[in-house]
């Protein structure tokens, strides 16, 4: 199915479902109309959601307001809002790692009964997003959100630079293989070193952009994206919260050493505290051959006047030294805030958003739908140049702790990773030993032992 067929199918799906959607929302009369506020991060998908939500407003009579906060302060602002019982947000598209705290502290309403009453099945969504965004405790049928935006860390690369005949010849002469999308992290580093300092498009370029940001979650998302494939585990699979020899295993140490080596060898200058936005800027300005970033950035690259179209390619996280291949989960679910006085109206938004035709339009506008009916459609993989990479990446995801103590756990990893990778303090083993000790202390305070 080509893109035109995909677009036509989405239009037909929308038409066939329109009356059902209107009926589902029809119980909200003009006299009952509410002003609802949805809280999320300030990024391109949020703008797409504003556009998408116009249809909900027209059908429901409710008016949507939006509170969008930059990613670097999103967690602080919104977790404070939840912890204080604030009434700013009726709907929250909260980060995946917040689900444990929001559930256990009564900050989101449980959605099981609502889903059952309205025929919304979690089996209809990508399994990794249900576990990652909706379930608490994990791997139990207790749902606190509807998967709203599937996301994952992957890579973009300068397809045009890779294809340039002189680059192909020089790379093969040096490494004995074709210059192609890396299948392993070792291959990725070779490519990064090859491009480091090379001249492309008339200027000096750099090998690879990776996350280093200290203040929120940046370097943790980047380092974990690599450590998973090297053999890092959060704890003993047979003994929860038993971290010694798993967080700080020899394989995990090798992964953190690799991440630092990639930063030291091949990052652009001035990237010692950089996250998503800096990566976008570095790639669009032609500074780097490869760039680590969440999939939400890919539509913007595809349409960019400088790097769009055939100039940019996409690939999933490569494999580690033993063949393990994982990627850091991103993305969020949409929840109803327990402190809201407009819960019934907020639930009508979730019901509307869950409709297959709305999810198809969400993808078309630049949102990453987690609905199987969208992503498993035969036309999906070819509907955008990055669609197949998104599917491949979502099949290998892992995520950070989603415990109620998430913020404290994240602060520890941010400190230890940044101090070692960027500041060059101590060794990788010392960093992971320190991290394991900090995490153990946090869980001891929670009574996990």
Language-model features: locations:
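Extracytoplasmic "Venus flytrap"/periplasmic binding protein-like
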Residues: 35, 51-128, 132, 165, ...
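Extracytoplasmic "Venus flytrap"
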Residues: 36-51, 69-72, 151-152, 217, ...
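Mature extracytoplasmic/periplasmic domains
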Residues: 55, 279-280, 295-304, 320, ...
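Conserved C-terminal helix/tail region of periplasmic/extracytoplasmic solute-binding proteins
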Residues: 63, 392-449
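Hinge/lid segment of periplasmic solute-binding proteins
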Residues: 96-154, 219-222, 311-315, 379-385, ...
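Extracytoplasmic/periplasmic solute-binding protein
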Residues: 135-149, 153, 184-244, 288
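Extracytoplasmic/periplasmic substrate-recognition and gating elements
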Residues: 137, 141, 160-161, 243, ...
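Glycine-centered hinge/linker elements that transmit conformational signals in sensory
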Residues: 187-196, 230-273, 317, 436
């Amino acid at each position: 199915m080509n893109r035109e067929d995909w677009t036509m199918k989405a239009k037909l799906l929308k038409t066939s479902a329109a009356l059902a959607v209107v009926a589902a929302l029809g119980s909200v009369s003009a006299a009952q109309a509410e002003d609802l506020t949805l809280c999320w991060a300030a990024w391109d998908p949020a703008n797409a959601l504003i556009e998408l939500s116009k249809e909900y407003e027209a059908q429901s009579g409710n008016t949507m307001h939006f509170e969008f906060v930059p990613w670097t302060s999103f967690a602080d602002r919104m977790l404070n809002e939840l912890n204080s019982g604030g009434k700013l947000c009726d709907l929250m598209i909260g980060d995946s790692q917040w689900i444990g705290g929001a559930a256990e502290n009564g900050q989101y309403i449980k959605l099981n009964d609502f889903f059952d009453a309205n025929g919304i099945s979690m089996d209809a969504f990508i399994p990794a997003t249900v576990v990652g965004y909706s379930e608490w405790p994990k791997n139990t049928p207790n749902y606190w959100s509807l998967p709203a935006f599937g996301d994952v860390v992957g890579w973009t690369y300068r397809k045009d630079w890779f294809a340039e005949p002189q680059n192909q010849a020089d790379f093969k002469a040096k490494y004995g293989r074709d210059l192609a999308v890396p299948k392993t992290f070792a291959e990725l580093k070779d490519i990064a070193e090859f491009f480091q300092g090379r001249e492309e498009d008339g200027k000096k370029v750099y090998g690879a952009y990776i996350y280093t940001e200290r203040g929120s979650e940046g370097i943790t998302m980047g380092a974990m994206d690599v450590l998973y494939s090297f053999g890092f585990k959060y704890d003993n699979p047979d003994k929860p919260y038993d971290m010694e020899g798993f967080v700080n295993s020899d394989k995990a140490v090798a992964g953190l050493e690799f991440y630092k080596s990639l930063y030291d060898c091949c990052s652009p200058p001035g990237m010692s505290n950089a996250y998503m936005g800096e990566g976008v800027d570095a790639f669009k300005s032609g500074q780097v051959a490869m760039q680590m970033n969440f999939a939400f950035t890919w539509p913007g690259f595809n349409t960019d006047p400088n790097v769009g179209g055939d100039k940019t390619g996409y690939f999933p996280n490569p494999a580690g030294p033993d063949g393990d291949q994982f990627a850091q989960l991103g993305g969020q679910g949409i929840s109803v805030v327990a402190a809201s006085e407009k819960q019934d109206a907020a639930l009508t938004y979730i019901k509307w958003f869950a409709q297959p035709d709305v999810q198809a339009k969400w993808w078309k506008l630049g949102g990453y739908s987690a609905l199987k009916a969208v992503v498993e459609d035969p036309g999906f993989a070819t509907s955008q140049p990055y669609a197949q990479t998104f599917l491949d990446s979502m099949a290998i995801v892992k995520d950070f702790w989603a415990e109620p103590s998430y913020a404290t756990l994240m602060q520890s990893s941010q400190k230890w990773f940044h101090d070692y990778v960027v500041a060059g303090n101590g060794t990788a083993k010392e960093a992971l030993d320190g991290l394991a000790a900090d995490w153990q202390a946090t869980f001891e305070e929670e009574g996990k032992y």
